Every structure is written in structure tokens, then in C-alpha cells.
């Protein structure tokens, strides 16, 4: 267990930073997505768990967690503007895109492990792209249906 935490200390630190940022943001401005603090924890924690399920090398989960945090940040930013009229459904659109993001993270995690990628920048980028591509594909699928 100690080796797991030591090897993934940057990944865990990125997750903790995003949780702290969203906690402060909700405390200061309120929950503009109207979904509760538990959702922010679940998205960031879920991205970390999905990345670790693929058993990749360290730094992969950090990229996935960063992408999850940025996706939430974009949704919070869009919904906090007074010009947006989302009827409170923007959080549901984010929620429905998470299965695709998880599938993308697991798929690229398996690819990175089988290809034996060793460079940290490549692993970090693969985690980020796995979440991002899966999320975007699911978003496009939601809006085409």
C-alpha cells in the first residue's frame, strides 16, 4: 500500500487540489450546477479509480484526474454566466457523459500498459486524452440522439 501511494503521489495530489478548489468555489459562489459537493468528489474520485483499474504506470491517473477536473470547471464556468439558460440540466449532461470518459480512460490505460510506455509526459497525456476523448464522444452521441 505504501508503494502504491508513493508511486502515485502526484496523481493523488492533483485530485486533492481539484477537490479543494471545488470546495472553495462552492463555499464562495455556491453550487451553480445544483448537484451537490458529493458529485465533484465522485467525478474526481471516479476518474482516479477508472485510471487505476487499468493498472497503468504512475502519472496516467494524474492526467485523467486533471481532465475530469477541467471538464467540471468548464461546466461550472458555463453555468455561472447569467446569459446561459440551461434550466438546471447542464449537470445531467455532464453526468451522462461520464461512462464514455471512464471507458476512454480504461481503454487508453490498457494500451499504455501493453505498449510499455515509460515517459511520464506520454503517460500523463494518455490519461488526459483517454478521459477527454471518451467524454467528447459521449457528448456528441448525446446531442445526436
Per-range role (PLM):
Residues 113-132:
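Interfacial loop-to-transmembrane junctions
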Residues 13-30, 72-80, 138-139:
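Membrane-embedded alpha-helical segments in integral membrane proteins
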Residues 77-110:
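Short alpha-helical packing/oligomerization segments
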Residues 134-145:
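Juxtamembrane boundary at the C-terminal end of a transmembrane helix
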Residues 7-23, 64-71, 129-132:
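Alpha-helical transmembrane segments
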Residues 39-65, 108-110:
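Canonical alpha-helical transmembrane segments
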Residues 12, 32-47, 89-102:
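Alpha-helical transmembrane segments of polytopic membrane proteins
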Residues 1-5, 17-32, 52-59, 83-91:
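Short juxtamembrane and helix-loop transition motifs at transmembrane-helix boundaries
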Amino acid at each position: 500500500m505504501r508503494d502504491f501511494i508513493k508511486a502515485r503521489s502526484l496523481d493523488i495530489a492533483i485530485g486533492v487540489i481539484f477537490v479543494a478548489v471545488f470546495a472553495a468555489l462552492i463555499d464562495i459562489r455556491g453550487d451553480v450546477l445544483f448537484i451537490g459537493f458529493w458529485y465533484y468528489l465522485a467525478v474526481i474520485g471516479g476518474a482516479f479509480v477508472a485510471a487505476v483499474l487499468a493498472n497503468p504506470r504512475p502519472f496516467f491517473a494524474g492526467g485523467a484526474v486533471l481532465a475530469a477536473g477541467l471538464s467540471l470547471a468548464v461546466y461550472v464556468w458555463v453555468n455561472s454566466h447569467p446569459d446561459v439558460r440551461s434550466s438546471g440540466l447542464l449537470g445531467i449532461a455532464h453526468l451522462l457523459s461520464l461512462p464514455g470518459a471512464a471507458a476512454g480512460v480504461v481503454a487508453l490505460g490498457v494500451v499504455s500498459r501493453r505498449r510499455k510506455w515509460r515517459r511520464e509526459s506520454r503517460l500523463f497525456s494518455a490519461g488526459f486524452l483517454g478521459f477527454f476523448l471518451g467524454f467528447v464522444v459521449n457528448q456528441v452521441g448525446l446531442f445526436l440522439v
